Amino acid sequence: MLVAVLDANVLFPMLLRDTLLRVAAAGCFRAHWSARILEEMTRNLLSDYGMEPSRAEALRIVIEEAFPDASVEGWEELEPDMRNDPKDRHVVAAAVAAGATVIVTSNIRDFSNVPDGIVAMTPDEFLSKIFAKDPTAVLEAITAQAAAYRRPALTTRELIERLALTSPGFAEQALEALDDR
């Protein structure tokens, strides 16, 4: 199974975060992060997205409880050996500690010098890769995601169209597959 570390910046946008986590919960890949990544997510939800502190903390707890094995330990001692951008070395160290082959990030440029066997991918590239492997499971996860939304209610098509903002290639593939159903 594909093992990926999710950078904090792919956990900020609600629809993208929810999609990645639901696809992971469907067994399409194994998601990992570190406590520091979740702290960065929480901090940015407060400062950039204006989320109330209690809601941001509740979200972090829900994520941790939904994925109890996702938190990576032992990355701290690896961080000094990483050679990518200093502010994102902790993400690469978490990937090494998790045995991940992929880092999913919206900030590819800071991951140009990572250890062999690890590749940084945008959410669009990553979701497209996952979709190519198991389109049925991904579409089922997205359909369940759309069905869970109430305010506003979204159809599967509408959800995929909104995902096109962060993942246009994936959205195009998913819409084509949806039309073929």
Protein language model features and the residues they cover:
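PIN/NYN-family metal-dependent endoribonuclease catalytic core
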Residues: V3, M14-D48
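Active-site neighborhoods of divalent-metal-dependent phosphate/nucleic-acid chemistry enzymes
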Residues: P68-V102, A153, G169, L178-R181
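Acidic, PIN/NYN-like endoribonuclease modules and their adjacent C-terminal/linker elements
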Residues: R109-R181
